[in-house]
Amino acid sequence: GFWKKVGSAAWGGVKAAAKGAAVGGLNALAKHIQ
């Protein structure tokens, strides 16, 4: 139903944000190491 779609979209956003933060953090760490 509606709320399941809302929850799924929210979870997708959370996962995307976490992935983006992880990638950004790794890139920053790699630059710092070099």
Curated annotation (Swiss-Prot):
Listed under GO biological process in this entry are: defense response to Gram-negative bacterium; defense response to Gram-positive bacterium
| Keywords from the UniProt entry | Antibiotic, Antimicrobial
- Protein's job: Has strong antibacterial activity against the Gram-positive bacteria M.luteus, S.aureus, B.megaterium, A.viridans and E.faecalis, and against the Gram-negative bacteria K.pneumoniae, E.coli DH5alpha, S.typhimurium, P.aeruginosa and E.aerogenes. Lacks hemolytic activity against sheep erythrocytes.
The protein in question is named Papillosin
Taxonomic lineage of this organism? Eukaryota, Metazoa, Chordata, Tunicata, Ascidiacea
